[in-house]
Amino acid sequence: MTENIPLRVQFKRMSADEWARSDVILLEGEIGFETDTGFAKFGDGQNTFSKLKYLTGPKGPKGDTGLQGKTGGTGPRGPAGKPGTTDYDQLQNKPDLGAFAQKEETNSKITKLESSKADKSAVYSKAESKIELDKKLSLTGGIVTGQLQFKPNKSGIKPSSSVGGAINIDMSKSEGAAMVMYTNKDTTDGPLMILRSDKDTFDQSAQFVDYSGKTNAVNIVMRQPSAPNFSSALNITSANEGGSAMQIRGVEKALGTLKITHENPNVEAKYDENAAALSIDIVKKQKGGKGTAAQGIYINSTSGTAGKMLRIRNKNEDKFYVGPDGGFHSGANSTVAGNLTVKDPTSGKHAATKDYVDEKIAELKKLILKK
């Protein structure tokens, strides 16, 4: 009875010279062809192509030993042969693939591949992972024009900021940047780097910087474009109403936790008269919003402070400040458009109010009339 066995043959092609210089190890049962000679070898999963034996047809019965003839002279050189071909169907001395399929060990390999739906890429990846990728790679350089994807398993990746990561670059003995992303295009479909997490339950930062050097931990420099526009050096947007869009915490001795310096982009003094070092805009919800009740500036000291709560200076001179007790100082005459109510008009540090003066004048008039 004849049994039909589904066959999937994995093979590689190179010239005889390329095979001789190649360190590729064929999988057990994988075929390697010499495209210029038409000969082939069967891989054993251990040796390179040059160490394997050529494939031959079925061995026939041993014939009678004949008499050794005389060695003939060297004949004339024959004409050049036809150009070789890489078309398998046109190769000479082709192995009998049907004979290979009838071998018990070959059938076992093919059945295993069919059961796991293995394809060419899967077989290559498996071979590389078991043979090549177990070795330490020493790359001296190269260019990849396609996409590289890393999908590591859970095991083997350390959660360390120095030796962990699916990709780890150690620059301890090198110069220059560990990673450079560059483009010279006018437009593109995406940014140079994207960090994304789709899960609300993800409990790690999208980016973490651990630094203790002598310069800034993060530098962002935006050059002046040929035509100034409304783009920003840093744009932060948060849709999480339970947290702040940005939190800053520092341990400064004589500096501000947040330092803002505005520089006039022009030599003319009034060129930037409409600019501000700090600008705050409070708006309602963009779609269907009816208003907002948010505060413009909120200052608080949860543990209490002996310093000024607000201090405004010009040319290093105090012009206005609010002390820790709420008292304020103004360095010049001030105009109040509305009413100014003084809670303690008799205080020696406050001027008398109009109501207070009118009341006392009325009392004085009554005393004069009685006399």
Swiss-Prot record:
Ubl conjugation listed as a keyword: no
GO molecular function, one term: hyalurononglucosaminidase activity
Alphabetical UniProt keywords: Degradation of host capsule during virus entry, Degradation of host cell envelope components during virus entry, Glycosidase, Hydrolase, Virion, Virus entry into host cell
UniProt-listed SUPFAM superfamilies: Phage fibre proteins
Places the protein is found: Virion
EC number: 3.2.1.35
Main location: virion
Reaction equations catalysed: Random hydrolysis of (1->4)-linkages between N-acetyl-beta-D-glucosamine and D-glucuronate residues in hyaluronate
GO cellular component: virion component
Secretion signal, residue range per the UniProt entry: none
InterPro entries in alphabetical order: Hyaluronidase_bac, Mtd_N
GO BP term, pick one: symbiont entry into host cell via disruption of host cell envelope
Gly residues: compositionally biased ranges: 69-78
Region of interest (Disordered), residue spans: 54-88
TM regions (residue ranges): none
Function statement: The hyaluronidase of this bacteriophage mediates the penetration of the hyaluronic capsule of Streptococcus pyogenes.
Family: Belongs to the glycosyl hydrolase 69 family.
Entry protein name: Hyaluronoglucosaminidase
